[in-house]
Amino acid sequence: MSLFVTFEGPEGSGKSTQARLLYESLYARRYPVILTREPGGTRIGDLIRRIVLDLQHTEMAPTTETLLFSAARAQLVSEVIRPYLEQGGIVLCDRYADSTYAYQGYGLGRDLAELRTITAAATGGLRPDITFYLDISAEDGLERKRRKHPGARLMGQRGVDQEWNRLDARELEYHQRVEAGYRALIAQDPERWRVLDARQSIEALAEQIAAIVEPYLASIPQLEAVPYS
């Protein structure tokens, strides 16, 4: 048996922190676990990440953006996710295909049927067992992220902090469409999603996530020793 867990949410939701904390907990308990992210997680994926998130690439067409994210995903599934799952391990992924539906589909207005076709090709139909959604409004999430990067501005303005990426910098209305898109996705597949209030403390969220994952661990054998990182 294996386990595939993904983390989704608007900007500033804290999903990356929670993915890392779950990874550290499972690793310490000697479970075979890896943590990866989208876009990225492979040499090719990291190169794509630099291109697709670069603030200077304001001329990028929506189709280009969609295909770049999907190319990074295809490489990640082929090189990292599927092989590790086939070995019976646990894969934690910071964003996955749902981000494409939310950000490029609902956010940019790309045709959802077309996105499903592209995603099926990129993933080979691989779906998560659990998807955690860290729930926070677009407004509150962006404010959180701006507090971390005080030089941040909206798209097209000067003086943007380099850690504030091209998608972060889009107008509030875009992020509101993304948030609404996530809610539509959750309604379509409620059994897979676990919705958690991202306004809680980091510790409270980590405890809830660990409790949800725990029953799935019964079928996954622990390693005899903690592997080298």
UniProtKB/Swiss-Prot annotation:
It is an enzyme of class 2 (transferase). It catalyses: dTMP + ATP = dTDP + ADP. Keywords: ATP-binding, Kinase, Nucleotide biosynthesis, Nucleotide-binding, Transferase. ATP binds at G9, P10, E11, G12, S13, G14, K15, S16. GO terms for molecular function: ATP binding; dTMP kinase activity. SUPFAM superfamilies: P-loop containing nucleoside triphosphate hydrolases. One of its GO terms (biological process) is dTDP biosynthetic process. Its EC number is 2.7.4.9. GO terms for cellular component: cytosol. NCBIfam families: DTMP_kinase. Phosphorylation of dTMP to form dTDP in both de novo and salvage pathways of dTTP synthesis. Belongs to the thymidylate kinase family. This is Thymidylate kinase. It comes from Roseiflexus castenholzii (strain DSM 13941 / HLO8). The gene is tmk.
